Structure formats: structure tokens, C-alpha cells
Amino acid sequence: MSDNDVAAKRLTKPKLERPKLYKVLLVNDDFTPREFVVMVLKAVFRMSEEAGYRVMMTAHKMGISVVVVCAKDVAETKAKEATDLGKEAGFPLLFTAEPEE
């Protein structure tokens, strides 16, 4: 093995794959008050009042709405935190995390 072969091997960088992204979804229900949903979106996802209202209304009209797209661990943590806030308040509020396509 020549010195050139060794140098070439040292300069080769491993290919790093980007982590797969996940989307957090807000699932509409007929019981959780709109104001509470917006409050959760503001608290957990740091949304403005206007952005939270838009996401909530999209879920209300379409049945589901994408809240945010982020890394898997962050998406799962945020979805659980937001769902837990609903449960603590006695509402069936549901957020899920699933792979972004």
C-alpha cells in the first residue's frame, strides 16, 4: 500500500444522512374548546395567536392539521406534551407524530 492510498482513505468523509423529519398533527374533536386548542398551540409550539388560530381552524374544517415538522424525538415529545395538557384539563385533545413523506 502506498502513501497515496493511505492519504486518500483518511480524506474520505463518511456520508451522513439527515435525520428523518416527523410532522406533528392536530386531530379535530367536537369537545375541546377552540380557545383551549389555541392556548396549547401557543404554549407548546410557541405559535402566535394568529398562527395557532389558523392551525386550529384547518383542523376544524379538514379534520386534521399539520402543526410543525421537526426531528422525531422533538415531534414525539411535543405531541405528548400537548395531548397531556388536554387530558389534564379533561378534554380529548389529540396530537400525533408521524413520518414526513
From Swiss-Prot:
GO BP: protein catabolic process; proteolysis
Q: Could you tell me the superkingdom of the organism this chain comes from? A: Bacteria
**Annotated InterPro entries:** ClpS (IPR022935), ClpS_core (IPR003769), Ribosomal_bL12_C/ClpS-like (IPR014719)
Q: Which residues form the signal peptide?
A: none
Tell me, in a sentence or two, what this protein's role is: Involved in the modulation of the specificity of the ClpAP-mediated ATP-dependent protein degradation.
Q: HAMAP family from the xrefs?
A: ClpS
State the family it belongs to.
Answer: Belongs to the ClpS family.
Query: Which PANTHER family does its entry note?
Result: ATP-DEPENDENT CLP PROTEASE ADAPTER PROTEIN CLPS, ATP-DEPENDENT CLP PROTEASE ADAPTER PROTEIN CLPS1, CHLOROPLASTIC
According to the record's subunit comment, the protein's assembly and interactions are:
Binds to the N-terminal domain of the chaperone ClpA.
Its recorded name reads ATP-dependent Clp protease adapter protein ClpS 2
Q: Which organism is it from?
A: Rhizobium meliloti (strain 1021)
Q: Which gene encodes it?
A: clpS2
